[in-house]
């Protein structure tokens, strides 16, 4: 699509029917101009001001679909006494990767430039995200000199080690699903496990770390049907439930939603179980 577009043939792939996926992805570019109260209308009772601070939080479009994760992160920041600037509440919507994968390179670059300017404007030195996809893109595709990019599992563990976030160790049995983008994509395996171990008992599934199965969902997945995705999610959930854990934990909004479709059990983001054990 990118090559066709650069040669003035951008409509070739749209001649047979309407490309709804491309239209949907491009809407992320225009979402920067959507009033905050409309984009965040489902955050009942949350402070929607963007705030200030050297730490910035970027939820991203996937995490916006799991508002409990965002709510939990807000409580983590509050408990640690962290002053935070909320990027998404000032127009930062998407890291740009979905647009890039769809061949909409110009729109992706526009989105990346916008986000970069937003980060520089606020002078943040640490950027925290709950989305492994955003994490990888910010680290590899953005020029963010002087800004440390952290996944929220890394950030939460750092707060715990620094004595800024105090949690209690309970008897709840947890199991953890390694997100593809966080584990195989960014090599982050130990931090989420250390956080879980601080609040309860961790039970590992049969396939874990580098060998952990994909949840079945992807921002660029067009190869399998929705029904097939659900079947994969059920298989993954079944393996996790076989550990005897009471709660399935993951650290990716896409994985959380996908696995949730495959089980009637409890599926939580890492930040949620931390908040439940803050002392």
Q: Residue locations for each model-derived region?
A:
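Short, surface-exposed amphipathic charged segments that create phosphate/polyanion-binding patches used
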Residues: 161-172, 217-223
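Catalytic cores of enzyme domains
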Residues: 152-155, 161, 172-185
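Cofactor-cradling patches in redox/metallo enzymes
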Residues: 61-151, 181-279
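Single conserved hydrophobic/aromatic residue that forms the stacking wall/gate
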Residues: 2-13
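A short, charged/proline- and glycine-enriched loop
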Residues: 49-55, 168-174
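Aromatic- and Gly/Pro-rich donor/ligand-binding loops
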Residues: 36, 50-71
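Membrane-anchoring hydrophobic helices of lipid-metabolizing enzymes
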Residues: 15-47
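Conserved beta-strand elements of the Class I
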Residues: 56-57, 175, 246-249
């Amino acid at each position: 699509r990118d090559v066709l577009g650069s040669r003035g043939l951008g409509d070739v792939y749209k001649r047979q029917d309407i490309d709804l996926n491309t239209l949907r992805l491009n809407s992320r570019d225009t979402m920067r101009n959507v009033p905050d109260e409309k984009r965040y209308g489902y955050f009942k009772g949350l402070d929607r001001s963007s705030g200030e601070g050297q730490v910035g939080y970027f939820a991203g479009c996937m995490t916006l679909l799991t508002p409990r994760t965002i709510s939990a992160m807000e409580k983590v920041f509050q408990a640690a006494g962290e002053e935070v600037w909320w990027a998404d509440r000032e127009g930062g919507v998407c890291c740009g990767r979905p647009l890039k994968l769809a061949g909409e390179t110009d729109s992706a670059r526009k989105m990346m430039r916008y986000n970069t300017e937003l980060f520089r404007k606020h002078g943040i030195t640490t950027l925290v995200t709950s989305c492994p996809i955003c994490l990888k893109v910010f680290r590899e595709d953005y020029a963010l000199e002087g800004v440390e990019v952290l996944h929220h599992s890394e950030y939460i563990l750092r707060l715990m080690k620094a004595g800024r976030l105090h949690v209690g160790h309970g008897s709840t049995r947890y199991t953890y699903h390694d997100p593809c983008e966080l584990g195989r994509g960014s090599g982050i395996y130990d931090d989420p496990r250390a956080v879980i171990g601080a609040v309860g008992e961790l039970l590992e599934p049969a396939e874990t770390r580098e060998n952990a199965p994909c949840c079945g969902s992807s921002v660029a997945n067009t190869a399998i049907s929705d029904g097939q995705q659900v079947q994969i999610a059920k298989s993954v959930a079944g393996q996790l439930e076989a550990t005897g854990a009471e709660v399935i934990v993951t650290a990716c909004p896409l994985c959380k939603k996908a696995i949730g479709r495959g089980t009637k059990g409890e599926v939580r983001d890492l930040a949620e179980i931390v908040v439940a054990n803050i002392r």
